[in-house]
A protein has these predicted regions:
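Active-site diphosphate/adenylate-binding microenvironment
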Residues: 3-69
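Flexible, low-complexity linker and terminal segments
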Residues: 1-3, 14, 202-271
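Conserved thiamine diphosphate
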Residues: 134-186, 190
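Glycine-rich beta-alpha junction loops
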Residues: 51-53, 123-125, 176, 200-206, ...
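Thiamine diphosphate
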Residues: 51-127
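Short, hinge-like loop/turn segments at secondary-structure boundaries
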Residues: 64-65, 109, 134-138, 187-188, ...
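Short coil/turn connectors at secondary-structure junctions
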Residues: 14, 41-45, 83-89, 111-116, ...
Length: 271
C-alpha cells in the first residue's frame, strides 16, 4: 500500500520556507508518509522542534506541536511523554540544535531510553544563522567560522547514540528516501525505548557553496556515491572508510523503556 501523508500537512502553507535545493522537504515527506503508515493520528501526536532551519518543520504539520528553545527539544519532549504517555511524541532536531547545543540532552535521553522518536536532520552546518560549523561538520570543511578548514573531528552521532544505550538507531540519507522512510516507520512502530534516526541532508546554500560541492542534484549524487551499508563497512579498514557515510540500522534491541520502568516505581511507591 502506498501512503502520501497529506493529512499531516498544512497544504495552505506550502511551499516550504526552506531554500531552493534544501533536503528538508524530502525528510518531511518521509516523516508524514511514515506517520500515516504507522497509523498515527494528528490528535494523538505531538511534534517538538527546536531552533534552526529544521525547527520550522512544525509550522507545516497538522499535529500538535511545541516549538522550543535552542538545544532543548528533547527536554520538552521528555516532559510531554512523562505527563501523557499515551501520546506519540516526535522530536525534530538539527545537528546544531540536537547534537551540538543540545548534545548532552541527546546522550541522556538515549541513556534513559525515553519512549520518544528523534529525527535529526544532519546537514553538517548551522544553516539559519549563516553556515557556522557544528558538532558534525567534518574535519577540514569550510564554514563561516572555519574559513581555512575545520580543525576539529566530527561526531558520528549514530554511533554516539547507539553507545549511549538507545533501543533503535538508524542512519539514512536524502539520496535514498524510500530507505529513510522505512527506518522512520520502524522507529514509529517500535513502542518502547529511545528511537533515533539520523537523516543525512544537504545544504546547498551554505555548506555546499562554501565547500564547492555544486548544486542540489550534484550534492545528492555525491551522497549516493559515498554511502555504504553497515554490512560492507564492517569489512573495511579505517582509511577505506574515510569520507564514507555508513548507512543502515546501527542497533535494534528490545528494552523496557523509561515509561514502563517509571510506572513500576509508581506502583511500589503507592503501596
Amino acid at each position: 500500500m502506498r501512503y502520501n501523508g497529506k493529512k499531516f500537512l498544512k497544504k495552505e502553507l506550502l511551499p516550504f520556507f526552506w531554500c531552493s535545493g534544501c533536503g528538508n522537504g524530502i525528510v518531511m515527506g518521509c516523516i508524514v508518509r511514515a506517520m500515516e503508515e504507522s497509523g498515527f493520528s494528528k490528535e494523538n501526536t505531538v511534534v517538538v522542534t527546536g531552533i534552526g532551519c529544521w525547527g520550522k518543520a512544525d509550522d507545516y504539520l497538522t499535529t500538535h506541536a511545541f516549538h522550543g528553545t535552542h538545544g532543548r527539544a528533547l527536554t520538552i519532549a521528555t516532559g510531554i511523554k512523562l505527563a501523557n504517555p499515551s501520546l506519540e511524541v516526535i522530536a525534530l532536531v538539527g545537528d546544531g540544535d540536537g547534537a551540538t547545543i543540545g548534545g548532552n540532552h541527546l546522550i541522556h535521553a538515549a541513556r534513559r531510553n525515553i519512549d520518544i522518536t528523534v529525527i535529526m536532520s544532519n546537514n553538517f552546518t548551522y544553516g539559519m544563522t549563516g553556515g557556522q560549523y557544528s558538532g558534525t561538520t567534518p574535519f577540514g570543511a569550510i564554514s563561516s567560522t572555519s574559513r581555512y578548514g575545520h580543525v576539529e573531528d566530527e561526531f558520528d552521532i549514530s554511533e554516539l547514540v547507539k553507545t549511549a544505550g538507545a533501543a533503535y538507531v538508524a542512519k539514512g540519507t536524502v539520496a535514498n528516501p524510500l530507505q529513510l522512510q522505512r527506518f522512520i516507520s520502524k522507529a514509529f512502530k517500535k513502542q518502547n525505548g529511545f528511537r533515533f534516526i539520523e537523516a543525512i541532508n544537504i545544504c546547498p546554500t551554505h555548506y555546499g557553496r562554501a565547500n564547492q560541492l555544486g548544486k542540489a542534484p550534484e550534492m545528492i549524487e555525491s551522497l549516493r556515491k559515498s554511502s555504504i551499508s553497515i554490512k560492507l563497512a564492517k569489512n573495511m579498514k579505517p582509511d577505506e572508510l574515510a569520507g564514507k557515510i555508513v548507512i543502515g540500522e546501527y542497533v535494534d534491541k528490545k528494552v523496557d523503556g523509561y515509561i514502563r520502568r517509571y510506572k513500576e516505581v509508581q506502583k511500589r511507591a503507592a503501596k
